[in-house]
From Swiss-Prot:
InterPro entries: PRA-CH (IPR026660), PRib_AMP_CycHydrolase_dom (IPR002496), PRib_AMP_CycHydrolase_sf (IPR038019). It catalyses: 1-(5-phospho-beta-D-ribosyl)-5'-AMP + H2O = 1-(5-phospho-beta-D-ribosyl)-5-[(5-phospho-beta-D-ribosylamino)methylideneamino]imidazole-4-carboxamide. This is Phosphoribosyl-AMP cyclohydrolase. Its EC number is 3.5.4.19. GO terms for molecular function: magnesium ion binding; phosphoribosyl-AMP cyclohydrolase activity; zinc ion binding. Binds 1 Mg(2+) ion per subunit. It comes from the Bacteria. Belongs to the PRA-CH family. Pathway: Amino-acid biosynthesis; L-histidine biosynthesis; L-histidine from 5-phospho-alpha-D-ribose 1-diphosphate: step 3/9. It is an enzyme of class 3 (hydrolase). The gene is hisI.
Length: 112
């Protein structure tokens, strides 16, 4: 594992995390991590976030059983955003949908 120093200072102590399905590449959700949730994720290989609405640490799946198991972690060129591929148990979205991104606003590829 490559050691990097993520830039948590740029966005008030948080970094955005884009979470994808490691098999399909489908985007599952966007969440945020602080340094503590990032370290917990590295240590446990399960996703931990910072809940901005509840203002607390959030271990994904601890309540719902819908755990996310880390398969790979990448950072962007500025070291202030993460892209994490996971093995998803159940739904990623609190609505029960597999992905949080299920509402089409525009899709020019309707004939796919």
């Amino acid at each position: 594992m490559t050691e990097v120093k993520l830039d948590f200072d740029k966005q008030g102590g948080l970094v955005p995390v884009i979470v994808t399905d490691y098999k399909t590449g489908q985007v599952l959700m966007l969440a945020y991590m602080n340094e503590v949730s990032y370290q917990l994720t590295l240590e446990t290989k399960q996703m931990h976030y910072w809940s901005r609405s509840r203002n607390e640490l959030w271990h994904k799946g601890a309540t719902s059983g819908h755990f996310q198991h880390v398969k790979s972690i990448k950072t962007d060129c500025d070291w202030d955003t993460l892209l994490i591929a996971v093995e998803q148990e159940g739904a990623a979205c609190h609505t029960g949908a597999y992905s949080c991104f299920f509402t089409d606003i525009y899709d020019d590829n309707q004939d796919r």
